[in-house]
Curated annotation (Swiss-Prot):
Residues 246-452 are annotated as: N-acetyltransferase. GO terms for biological process: cell morphogenesis; cell wall organization; lipid A biosynthetic process; peptidoglycan biosynthetic process; regulation of cell shape; UDP-N-acetylglucosamine biosynthetic process. It is an enzyme of class 2 (transferase). The keyword Cytoplasm applies. Keywords: Acyltransferase, Cell shape, Cell wall biogenesis/degradation, Cytoplasm, Magnesium, Metal-binding, Multifunctional enzyme, Nucleotidyltransferase, Peptidoglycan synthesis, Repeat, Transferase. Mg(2+) binds at residues 100, 222. Its cofactor is Mg(2+). NCBIfam families: glmU (TIGR01173). Residues 1-224 are annotated as: Pyrophosphorylase. This is Bifunctional protein GlmU.
Length: 452
């Protein structure tokens, strides 16, 4: 089949400089959701009709399998599809989708395509409040004969609850002829794609319908209110899938998945968590409240406390992290590593059973196994122009308030005394410290303020 995605609308009610189809749901542009769904149908040609936002839309959505057609003037949906005619392949069916209707499922579209074998098929839905939608008009035998837009509908037609979603599968061989016969003598002065229904009926071609599993599948976005409503619906759908798969969610209404979340068994996720990019949670991982994980792999049995922020990191099994821990890109933690509150790790490898339990910065470092990093420890990795590496070998104990001025190496089994500023390599199995001699001045008095 061919698939044409209409993405030329301006979206005035969005009150935004960003083209409507580029506004995100679950961290991905509306139109990208539609494109990704379309790809699962393996179309012969996949064409995006763009207009408002022009090159921004093209550059954002660009992909080798996409063809493009420009609708310079927005003269209606029929006019929009006509711009794509020269790009269509020879496939028997052409499926028309909308770049601002992001949640239609592959299963629903397959039903629509099946209904449209040797016919024209339209996706319809019954709404409790059909206001604003084109109504499906049927004859006495129940056959669909036309779609009447809201602005052109009579009072009797406005009472119809079955409405047009705009999504349809059209016989490719008839599409160009039908589009050429469209007229714009309507309240909007536009060329409606829906008018091809009457043309098909006049030719004696059957017009069949299919319906989605849920109303949310065909909801479009025309305002920030609708964008927020659809975001919540989508997140509830994703949360429902997690629950069915065995994940324990403290509250399905308070989770955001903005990418791909895979998981093992007995995973638990508390409220307010955000998952971006590709996140993998192995068996028995626990994620505390209000954590952000972006492109992170977490090993089995690891516990993550509240308010952690991890990005582009790999966490080994049975770790204990947080609260308020931050892992920046390039971090790799081995098994049973502890990263505690207000500890930041960047582009560092930390070996098994090592601990940095509080108030530390570890950057551009390679830390061995069973290392204890005391509170207030800082790897001084940046001289204002270049980054340098710190190496801490196995079984090292680093006292509190220690600065390691890279490049520097701490040998296996070494101990660094509290308050040390290390500027040279520390030998293995020895105590290294640097601090001024402690002094006491008897009788010393603090300065006193003099009242003026």
């Amino acid at each position: 089949m061919n698939i044409v995605i209409l993405a030329a609308g301006q979206g005035k009610r969005m009150h935004s400089n960003l083209p409507k189809v580029l506004h995100p749901i679950a961290g991905k542009p509306l139109a990208q959701h539609v494109i990704d769904t379309a790809r699962q149908l393996s179309p012969e040609k996949l064409i995006v009709v763009y207009g408002h936002g022009g090159e921004v839309v093209r550059s954002t959505l660009a992909a080798p399998d996409l063809s493009w057609a420009e609708q310079a003037q927005q003269l209606g949906t029929g006019h929009a599809v006509a711009q794509a005619l020269s790009e269509l392949g020879s496939a028997a069916q052409t499926l028309v989708l909308y770049g601002d209707v992001p949640l239609t499922t592959v299963a629903t579209l397959k039903r629509l395509l099946q209904a449209g074998k040797d016919a024209l098929s339209v996706l319809t839905v019954d709404l409790a409040n059909p206001s604003g939608y084109g109504r499906i008009v049927r004859d006495g035998a129940g056959n669909m004969i036309s779609i009447v837009e809201e602005k052109d509908a009579s009072a009797e037609q406005k009472a119809i609850r079955e409405v047009n979603t705009g999504i349809m599968a059209v016989p490719t061989a008839r599409l160009a002829d039908w589009l050429g016969k469209l007229k714009n003598d309507n309240a909007q002065g536009e060329y409606y794609l829906t008018d091809i229904i009457a043309l098909a009926v006049a030719e004696g071609m059957p017009v069949r319908t299919a319906q989605p599993e849920g109303e949310w599948e065909v909801l479009g976005v025309n305002s920030k209110v609708q964008l927020a409503e659809l975001e919540r619906q989508h997140q509830l759908n994703l949360a429902g899938e997690l629950l069915v798969a065995g994940v324990r969610l403290a509250d399905p209404a308070r989770i955001d998945i903005r990418g791909e979340l895979t998981h093992g068994r007995d995973v638990a996720i508390d409220v307010g968590c955000v998952f971006e990019g590709k996140v993998e949670l192995a068996d028995a991982v626990e994620v505390g409240p209000y954590c952000v994980l972006k492109n992170v792999k977490v090993g089995a049995g690891t516990r993550i406390a509240a308010f952690c922020h991890f990005e582009d990191a790999v966490i080994g099994p049975d770790g204990v992290l947080g609260p308020y821990a931050r892992l920046r890109p390039g971090t790799e933690l081995g098994p049973e590593v502890h990263i505690g509150n207000f500890v930041e790790v960047k582009k560092s490898i930390i070996g098994a059973q090592s601990k940095a339990n509080h108030l530390a910065y570890i950057g551009d470092a390679e830390i061995g196994q069973r290392v204890n990093v005391g509170a207030g420890t800082i790897t001084c990795n940046y001289d204002g122009a270049n980054k340098f590496k710190t190496v801490i070998e196995d079984d090292v104990f680093i006292g509190s308030d220690t600065q390691l001025v890279a490049p520097v190496t701490v040998g296996r089994g070494a101990t660094l005394g509290a308050g040390t500023t290390l500027t040279k390599d520390a030998p293995p199995d020895a105590l290294t410290f640097s601090r001024p001699r402690q002094m006491t001045l008897p009788g010393w008095e603090r300065p006193k303020k003099v009242k003026k």
